[in-house]
Amino acid sequence: MTSQSHGAPPVPSSRPPASRVPVSGYDSHDSHSVSSSHSSHSPVTTHHHPAPPPPASRPVRESGVAPVTAPEPIAAPEPIAAPEPIPAPEPIAAPVPEGLKSEHKPVEREHKPVERKPVSSPAEKSIPASSPVHKAAPTPAASHAVPTSQKSAKSTPGSYAGIPSLQLIDGNKEFNPDVSSYFKKVHLDRAGLDYHVVAVFGSQSTGKSTLLNALFGTQFDVMNETARQQTTKGIWMARAQLEAPHSANSAHSQDCSDSGVLVMDVEGTDGRERGEDQDFERKSALFALATSEVLIVNIWEHQIGLYQGANMGLLKTVFEVNLNLFATSQNRSLIMFVIRDHIGATPLANLSTTLKTDMGKLWDSINKPEGLEHAKLEDFFDLQFTALPHKLLQPNEFYADVEQLACRFTVPKDPNYVFKPVYHRNVPLDGWSFYAEQVWDQIEQNKDLDLPTQQILVARFRCDEIAAGALDIFLSLLVKIRDQLSGGAVASAVLGGLMGEARKQTVDEYDSQASRYTPSVYSATLEKLEDRVDNDLGKVYQSYLAQLKRESLEQFNAALESSSALTFGENLSRASKAAHAHFIDNAKQVTAAIGQPNSSHFSYDDTLAALEQELDTLRDHKSKVEIDRLISRSAKRFKSSFHEEFDENLNKPDETVWDRILESFETLLNASIKKIDPNYSPSAPSAFSFGFGSPKTSAEGLKQIQQEAWAVFGAELKELSKEEQVLSRLKNKFKESFRYDANGVPIVWRPGDDIDGAFAKSREQALEIMPLLSTAKLSSGKSIEPTVALEDDEDDDDETAFAVILTPKRQASLIEKFKKQAEGLYLEAKRSTIQSTTQIPLYMYGLLLLLGWNEIMAVLRSPVYFMFLLVAAGAAYVIHTLHLWGPLTHMTNTMIAEATDMAKAKLKQVLNEAPTGETREREAPVGSSRDDVELKDL
């Protein structure tokens, strides 16, 4: 796209009148040099641009570029012959008239690394042949397919030449918010991407502003050489007023670019005004490097080879931070070294080699972020080198070389043209203000640029040294404090006083020596020292709190175990309060004595919370143990009482027996609960309380007491369901009617009594209680069921399972067994009547006396026999008087049975030891009758 041309600005008044030296012409094939130069450059090759014939008095100066890995070569468009200009009476600055259109179409570029919408190129405006301007060749933006905004009014340089430059960032590091307004004043508000940014970097008072004014036609303030003081403060910006070469023979007179160039004049480095404060130097240099396409490094020839003089230290810091902050953006920049006051003794090629070597070493020494450890300088920057003679001693040569240098910024066909598409940040100009402000904010927030001054370094060293000495004193005091704490019990106020005194002595020791150094360093080191001291004292403090907690817990346990007239609940509450108060009082004393109540190192809140948690756990455990003890004791007391009531009621079974049993159960249960809580009422069970613990614990305890009571009831029913229990109660009921009369007098059966009728009646009465022994049912017909769920019955779906004692099948089996036992009693009664009829005749007693008279007299006459008779008679009398015949008979029978068993065992042993084959046959006595067998069994 062909850019519109404009008139050349006037030469600044400071420039002495000198004839322009034309730039060497190009051959016809030079129209392709822009593209071919990309591919021909190598990292070590220095390129020279054409220069005017040098005077005899000075050597020819060269300029070189050391581009690094170049981007893919951009195919150059076919050269297009410019159309003949259309005659026009005056240069026109207004928009292109409708009738004036270019006769050729815009050339379509092949290389488009960034996709943008193409914009039709405006028609070329006719210019008078006598006008001293040249036609600009397509800008890099055009060759890179970057659209440019179509300007509504083309301004000549004179239309904004009087506008002063803008202070982009002031000396206080504040970004100017009026940047967009300035762009509008200099007619760049619609430039879009058709603009370029150039910045200058160098030491103070080295002629940076002078170089920019001469090179770009700007009007930056320059130094008053009689005063030699700082002129540029902060970062200033102005629009360049570029001119074409003045020589009519210049081959570039028709190929100059009209792209808007913004020039940033950066405050010089190493100025006496800022002294050791290099913060702004670093940040301004980094800002210039990050936002500009071309960074001009203004350096005197005698500074080359120096480290500080050539700003190598500053460049190292800037490169390192730039790599960390902006490496991901993958932007490239051109660093152009302009060597001032070049006298020619050292060729430019040698100076360039020295600078490239220094830059390479500098790049290798920086700390690179992860993933870029092997990155090279050439991956991010291209280098160019040029030299200028002394401005005051050789003014004509100086301005001639400046004019040649300007071709690199104005003529895209120049082999060393600087505004390559790869350098552009691709930020439209209407958004550049926001972009630059964000870059500045990011630089401002980066701490890597806040490097200390020598004064701060000294302050840091001395403050650290003093703090280390004070810390040694503190550590010696800390050992004594720890020994005293581990030696045994120590008063909290005493321990806190020792800790507070150690802290104060340490801080005073530091303060007495370090307070005269830089306040910020002094305060920062003091803060670190206090944090270290508080951290170490905090460990001792926490150890003491742990000891206090153990003491409080031991005191709690001792108070509970000690005998007291108080109830368990009252004793538990008193012990908890005493343990809590013991910890709080001592913790407050030691904290107050230290004198740091707001420090997080001396807070007992966490330990207090841990103590309260452990006290809660202990209270719950002790309460559970006490509740279990109360429930167990209540259950034992209830079990013994209820067992007696249960048996007593079942001994007199009738239709209301279970009503009486249930009433006894409830009475005993309520009495047992009232032993624990005298205020308990069955109508308000929720009011029950153990006197300690939570209401939930009391409710669960009451339920457990009721469950234990019903479990006892269930155990009694299970005991009742046993076979011997049922048969015993049926048999007792049968005997009560069969053997005793209505007055409870034993019945002596005589011959002729109706034993059969009495037997049938008694058996019937005994069987009548069988239903009562089979189901626990009230007289109303309702079965007895527990009022609380029992653990054994949780999986039982039958609600009446608790009341069932005997199943119908078991009832039938037990009735049959009972009848057999009743029949045995019936036979016994029958035999007693037979024995009463079979008595000894009276004459037998007479015969016994007559026949035994001699034996009787022998006994009476013998003292031994007589004494034996008296003893036997006395023993019989005593046994009879004490009613011991039964026990004696039982004992005798037992002894006989034991003797019989032993005899049988011995006999069996003898038989087992008999020879094999020998058999013994035992036969029943012949002639034994059935009655004899039955009588023997009876």
UniProtKB/Swiss-Prot annotation:
UniProt cross-references to InterPro entries, sorted A to Z: G_GB1_RHD3_dom (IPR030386), P-loop_NTPase (IPR027417), RHD3/Sey1 (IPR008803), Sey1/RHD3-like_3HB (IPR046758)
Q: Where is the GB1/RHD3-type G domain?
A: 192-423
Residues assigned to the Cytoplasmic compartment are 1-839, 885-938
What EC number is given for this enzyme? 3.6.5.-
Segments of skewed composition (Low complexity): 33-45
Q: Which PROSITE patterns match?
A: G_GB1_RHD3 (PS51715)
Biased composition, class Pro residues, residue ranges: 74-94
Record's bilayer topology term: Multi-pass membrane protein
Question: Topological domains (Lumenal): residue ranges?
Answer: 861-863
Kindly list the positions annotated as binding GTP: G202, S203, Q204, S205, T206, G207, K208, S209
Q: List localization entries.
A: Endoplasmic reticulum membrane
Transmembrane segment boundaries: 840-860, 864-884
| Annotated Polar residues bias | 146-158
Q: Which residues form a coiled coil?
A: 603-630
| Compositionally skewed regions (Basic and acidic residues) per UniProt | 100-118, 918-938
Please report which protein family the annotation says this sequence is part of: Belongs to the TRAFAC class dynamin-like GTPase superfamily. GB1/RHD3 GTPase family. RHD3 subfamily.
User: PANTHER family given for it?
Assistant: PROTEIN SEY1
Role noted for this protein: Cooperates with the reticulon proteins and tubule-shaping DP1 family proteins to generate and maintain the structure of the tubular endoplasmic reticulum network. Has GTPase activity, which is required for its function in ER organization.
Protein name per UniProt? Protein SEY1
**Protein's organism:** Yarrowia lipolytica (strain CLIB 122 / E 150)
**UniProt gene name:** SEY1
